[in-house]
Structures are given as structure tokens and as C-alpha cells.
């Protein structure tokens, strides 16, 4: 008897999810992909980018990123939680909590927002050894909050702000790891 009730609940859930009028207000998922060649060894790239404190080095000053928790160890690990304040809009402080969910040393790691300014944030950091250095790829999937209003915010300023952050990071990487080092 209970399994029938459970089965009916699943059928109801499936029907409701497919024909839910609230789906009209569900926001879009956006994707940002950035690739950069770095003329250093895979070991050197991993050593730098897998240290959470270096996030502050790679973040534009106007965001005023400040860690609010103690970071344990020098290298990230699955389950590591980082909390920080950023000021992305009009200098207004926002709390952000991310978790490192996956780490494959010298290949990739993933951070996901647990609480913060986005409805969803999933950021993959990939490293591939190539001739003369490393190809670093960032792949971000994100959703803005507030449904269609969030989609409007993405088109008006969030997308441009993320692009600007990665322009800054590209220049910072070129400054930290110049071609003639």
C-alpha cells in the first residue's frame, strides 16, 4: 500500500514539474568559458591556482574580496568551504560561501556556491599540459537570482562584470607568469 502511495506521489511530482506555471519565472542558466595559455610547468600552475589564498591575487581590487574564515592547509581539498565578502554592486558588501566539491590534482577542481549572490554557481578549473606550458580553462555555469529580473540583470551588467573579471585575471596571469621568465 505504501509503495502505491509513493508511486502516485512520484507521478504527481513529475506532472507538476512538467506543467508548473511557475516555470515561466525560472531563470536561464548561463555559461562562460575562458581559456588561457600559461608558459609555466603544470606543477607550477597547479601550485599557484590550487592555493585558495591566491584567489585574492586574481580578483580585481574594486570587488574588495575579504576571506571571512580560516583556510586550512595550503592546498584545496574536496569539502573545503571558503567564506568571503565581496562588493560587486555599488560597493554593497555581499556574503559568499563556496565549497570545493571535486579535486583531481594537476587536472581540475570545482567550486560551487553554497550561499551568495547567485541562484547557482558552478565553476570548473581545468589544467592541461601542452607544449611550452599549460592551457588553463575556466568553465562557469551560473544563474542570477530573481527569475526574469535576474536575466535582465545578466544582460545589463552581470555578464559584462564577469567578462571584466576574466580580462583582469588574464592580465594578472600574464604579469605573474611572463613569456620570458
State where each predicted segment sits.
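Beta-strand/loop substructures that line and gate deep hydrophobic ligand-binding cavities in soluble
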Residues: 113-164
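Hydrophobic ligand-binding cavity/cleft-lining segments
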Residues: 23-77
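A short, structured loop/turn motif at beta-sheet edges
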Residues: 42, 101-108, 126-135
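Short, surface-exposed coil-to-beta transition loops
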Residues: 31-33, 93-97, 119-123
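Glycine-rich portal/gate segments that line the openings of hydrophobic small-molecule binding cavities
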Residues: 67-115, 168-171, 175, 180-181
Amino acid at each position: 500500500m505504501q509503495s502505491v502511495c509513493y508511486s502516485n506521489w512520484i507521478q504527481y511530482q513529475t506532472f507538476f514539474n512538467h506543467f508548473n506555471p511557475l516555470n515561466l519565472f525560472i531563470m536561464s542558466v548561463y555559461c562562460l568559458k575562458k581559456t588561457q595559455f600559461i608558459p609555466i610547468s603544470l606543477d607550477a600552475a597547479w601550485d599557484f591556482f590550487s592555493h585558495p589564498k591566491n584567489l585574492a591575487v586574481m580578483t580585481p581590487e574594486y570587488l574588495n574580496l575579504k576571506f571571512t574564515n580560516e583556510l586550512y592547509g595550503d592546498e584545496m581539498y574536496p569539502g573545503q568551504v571558503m567564506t568571503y565578502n565581496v562588493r560587486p554592486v555599488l560597493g554593497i558588501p555581499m556574503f559568499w560561501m563556496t565549497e570545493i566539491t571535486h579535486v583531481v590534482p594537476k587536472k581540475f577542481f570545482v567550486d560551487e556556491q553554497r550561499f551568495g549572490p547567485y541562484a547557482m554557481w558552478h565553476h570548473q578549473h581545468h589544467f592541461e599540459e601542452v607544449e611550452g606550458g599549460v592551457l588553463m580553462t575556466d568553465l562557469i555555469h551560473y544563474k542570477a537570482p530573481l527569475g526574469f529580473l535576474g536575466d535582465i540583470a545578466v544582460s545589463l551588467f552581470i555578464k559584462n562584470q564577469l567578462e571584466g573579471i576574466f580580462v583582469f585575471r588574464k592580465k594578472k596571469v600574464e604579469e605573474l607568469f611572463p613569456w620570458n621568465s
